[in-house]
């Protein structure tokens, strides 16, 4: 799972510049093709969302939603960066999961 993460600032910038964006009321998704056979995930939560406890909770919810839906019919070979919006700070798991699946369907990589 370690190789499936986007960690470096340079990698995030590449996805922001070269990728296409999709958004809804809770999340923003930037997606860009990579040269691997796997999807790589990056999560970004601004300080506007709340204090560190809230930001980390939102990050955990996004990562867990992605992990549980990873084995379903999802196309491979993409870099995905999810950005949490301010309205996501008080949402529960089901809300985050439905927003995440909605964005993946908009991007055309989730069937």
UniProtKB/Swiss-Prot annotation:
Q: Which UniProt keywords apply?
A: Endonuclease, Hydrolase, Nuclease, RNA-binding, tRNA processing
One GO molecular-function annotation for this sequence? Answer: 3'-tRNA processing endoribonuclease activity
Output the superkingdom of the source species.
Bacteria
Example of a GO biological process term = tRNA 5'-leader removal
| GO terms under cellular component | ribonuclease P complex
UniProt feature coiled coil, ranges: none
Provide the E.C. number(s) assigned to this enzyme: 3.1.26.5
Please list the reactions this protein catalyses. Endonucleolytic cleavage of RNA, removing 5'-extranucleotides from tRNA precursor
Q: Does the keyword tRNA processing apply?
A: yes
Function field: RNaseP catalyzes the removal of the 5'-leader sequence from pre-tRNA to produce the mature 5'-terminus. It can also cleave other RNA substrates such as 4.5S RNA. The protein component plays an auxiliary but essential role in vivo by binding to the 5'-leader sequence and broadening the substrate specificity of the ribozyme.
Q: Which PANTHER family match?
A: RIBONUCLEASE P PROTEIN COMPONENT (PTHR33992:SF1)
Q: Which NCBIfam families match?
A: rnpA (TIGR00188)
The family classification in the record reads: Belongs to the RnpA family.
Describe its partners and assembly state: Consists of a catalytic RNA component (M1 or rnpB) and a protein subunit.
Q: What is this protein called?
A: Ribonuclease P protein component
Q: Which gene encodes it?
A: rnpA
């Amino acid at each position: 799972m370690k190789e499936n993460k986007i960690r470096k600032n340079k990698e995030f910038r590449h996805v922001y510049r070269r990728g296409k964006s999709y958004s809804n009321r809770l999340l923003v998704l930037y997606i860009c093709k990579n040269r691997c056979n796997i999807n790589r995930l990056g999560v970004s939560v601004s300080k506007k969302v709340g204090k560190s406890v809230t930001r980390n909770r939102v990050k955990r919810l996004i990562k867990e939603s992605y992990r549980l839906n990873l084995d379903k019919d999802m196309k491979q070979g993409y870099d995905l960066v999810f950005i949490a919006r301010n309205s996501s700070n008080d949402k529960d798991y089901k809300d985050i999961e439905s927003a995440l699946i909605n964005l993946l369907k908009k991007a055309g990589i989730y069937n």
